[in-house]
Amino acid sequence: MISPTNLLPARKITPVSNGGAATASPSSPSVAARPRRLPSGLQSVTGRGKVSLAAITLDDYLPMRSTEVKNRTSTDDITRLRLITAVKTPYLPDGRFDLEAYDSLINMQIEGGAEGVIVGGTTGEGHLMSWDEHIMLIGHTVNCFGSRIKVIGNTGSNSTREAVHATEQGFAVGMHAALHINPYYGKTSAEGMISHFEAVLPMGPTIIYNVPSRSAQDIPPEVILAISGYTNMAGVKECVGHERVKHYADKGITIWSGNDDECHDSKWKHGATGVISVTSNLVPGLMHSLMYKGENATLNEKLSPLMKWLFCQPNPIALNTALAQLGVARPVFRLPYVPLPLEKRAEFVRIVESIGRENFVGQKEARVLDDDDFVLISRY
């Protein structure tokens, strides 16, 4: 049980005999006492044969103390999820959230078999939201759907301070788990990544997100192994590929594929638990079948053109275009995103016809929208 009076204790660094490495001895029962596994190459940076972590101080004071909040969902509950949708955020013409369209989309995910949603992730454009908007949307999702689907808030940041504050707030409004990326743009060392994740792990179930194409820095396996013993470490959304998925699965670490076009083989051939999916926004039922009904190369091949189309430009450009063409969301884009060109919109209609309109979300026929149908918002 997490101590309500000492959520993030300062670590005591003591030398051990295994080659001069240091161990972190937390004084809180929220983190199991165990030797700290440091990345190779970091064993002798002080010149005294052990790592000095004297400059790392974890704050003792955090405003969210409730053990009731923290124990709402167990980490095991999260590790069992096979289909998690990285859900899109729809907008009104003035740039505000279209909560009616959002609620409808979440209902479609639940009806299609999705077991969890990532709120405010890359696909949901969390990076285009203020933190007030972000936490409001997490809280809204929990309040409306939290008893029917797991709500995983993207509260990660390249700033540890912001990640800590947002994660506190996310769990305070009821999210079941947090998604955390490694510090991007400014980047950090492997040891810095470990300390960054350790600052948020005591708060509740956590999924680590590795997407080097966006963060510009791979999370090396030794970092994941170093934090894998934490009670709240649910697993990794991994975008590097099958070899990395298998590496973690063989070590008993829960892995979700972050690549829709690889998720079938990652699940059935390489040991992934499931997928955190963009495609399931459009065809949740088919993605549920892909994750639950055994190896199915035919279905995977059937979905391949859609998956390829969805990532023809940086996500979520194509998804936003598709949901507008299906009439599920208004054709409103927060800049810098703009819709796909006309020929790609026409291609999507053909893909819908090929897969079958009945497999897609919404009730309206897919149609090719004109350029003038779209609204681009720069102030929101």
UniProtKB/Swiss-Prot annotation:
Listed pathway(s): Amino-acid biosynthesis; L-lysine biosynthesis via DAP pathway; (S)-tetrahydrodipicolinate from L-aspartate: step 3/4
Keywords recorded for this protein, A-Z: Allosteric enzyme, Amino-acid biosynthesis, Chloroplast, Diaminopimelate biosynthesis, Lyase, Lysine biosynthesis, Plastid, Schiff base, Transit peptide
EC number of this enzyme: 4.3.3.7
Catalytic residues (positions): Y209, K237
Domain of life of the native organism: Eukaryota
Gene3D superfamilies in the cross-refs: Aldolase class I
Part of a proton relay during catalysis (site feature) positions: T122, Y185
Pfam families: DHDPS (PF00701)
Enzyme class name: lyase
UniProt activity-regulation remark: Sensitive to lysine inhibition. This inhibition increase in an allosteric manner with increasing concentration of the inhibitor.
Subunit structure: Tetramer of modified subunits derived from two genes in different combinations.
Protein name: 4-hydroxy-tetrahydrodipicolinate synthase, chloroplastic
Organism: Zea mays
